[in-house]
Amino acid sequence: MSRHEGVSCDACLKGNFRGRRYKCLICYDYDLCASCYESGATTTRHTTEHPMQCILTRVDFDLYYGGEAFSVEQPQSFTCPYCGKMGYTETSLQEHVTSEHAETSTEVICPICAALPGGDPNHVTDDFAAHLTLEHRAPRDLDESSGVRHVRRMFHPGRGLGGPRARRTNMHFTSSSTGGLSSSQSSSYSPSNREAMDPIAELLSQLSGVRRSAGGQLNSSGPSASQLQQLQMQLQLERQQAQAARQQLETARNATRQRSNPSNISASIPPPSTATNTAMTESNPLASHSSQFLLTRLNEPKMSEAERQALESERADRSLFVQELLLSTLMREESSSSDEDERRDFADFGAMGCVDIMPLDVALESLNLKESSTGKEPPPPPL
């Protein structure tokens, strides 16, 4: 393995990088590549004073050590997470912690669990000495006859340390006692078994990450699917309401049209066939002619023969009276027009200086009237 699979640098964000990997033993899940570590990359939570554990890939270890085999008694490079000193083996690291940092309760990450294949790279504990005693104590008499361990991690010289360390407040840790592998178990594994453990652990971690991401996607897509269903239901209801309103408007319009134009009722109804059309056109005149007298017939009261004869005589008298009245009015108009013509002619004749000849009886009457008027007049008064 020439890459750190599944690991990314928190400074340059390079994933699956090559070369040395430096893991912070104070910050949770914080890794740096060799270039960022040497350049002194820092963040708000990570400083250059934090102790780091150097982790090598298989290819880099073979390149540096040439495939040499180291026994259990020979030194291995682990870093103390409290003081930052390097070059400890599992046994020497435990002795150093119990003697120097027995009363320290700062939460740190176990460098052995982070460096060993198959271990928890982010195992946080606030009792590091007890963790080493329970998980990484290796009795020497239980080792295999070969007594050989293929060291994969190395100590990086030139690592400085200085200044106090602040206690971390936002730290996630597990109190499980099975987080790491014991030295007896790890020492019994051959190099081939250790090499086979790395891809299995990586596959398990990848599968767990895929399951979590899939679960998050399902949870996030659940509400969206329900919201889409609700929107579809609302759209269907709105469409149904709009169709019902349109139907009501159409029926109201048809009713008003039928009331305003009753003759268009037959035109608005579609004809079923041509034969029925011809039959309706033939029967329409008769129906209209008979419908004219329908109301009159219904309104006529039932009368006897004598009543009918009396009614007919009254109607005849009324008609005669109306005829005579019309004739008399016409005759009066003609006579009045002739009298007016005669008067006009007499006025014209008098204007010409002619005297009209009066009849004899008219002249006598006018004379008698004059005599009577002269006889009855009083005598004129004396002068």
Curated annotation (Swiss-Prot):
EC number: 2.3.2.27
Transferase in keyword set: yes
Annotated Zn(2+) 2 binding sites: 24, 27, 46, 50
UniProt keyword Ubl conjugation present: no
Origin: domain of life: Eukaryota
One Pfam family of this chain: zf-Di19
Sorted UniProt keywords: Coiled coil, Cytoplasm, Endosome, Lysosome, Metal-binding, Transferase, Ubl conjugation pathway, Zinc, Zinc-finger
GO BP, sorted A to Z: negative regulation of HRI-mediated signaling; protein K63-linked ubiquitination; synaptic signaling
Ranges of biased composition (kind: Polar residues): 280-289
Biased composition (Low complexity): 175-192, 260-279
Spans annotated as Disordered: 141-194, 242-289
Coiled coil regions in record: 224-261
A single GO cellular-component term on record: synapse
Zinc fingers (ZZ-type) by residue: 4-60
Family as reported in the entry's similarity comment: Belongs to the KCMF1 family.
PANTHER family: E3 UBIQUITIN-PROTEIN LIGASE KCMF1 (PTHR12268:SF13)
Protein's name in the database: E3 ubiquitin-protein ligase KCMF1
Lineage: Eukaryota, Metazoa, Chordata, Craniata, Vertebrata
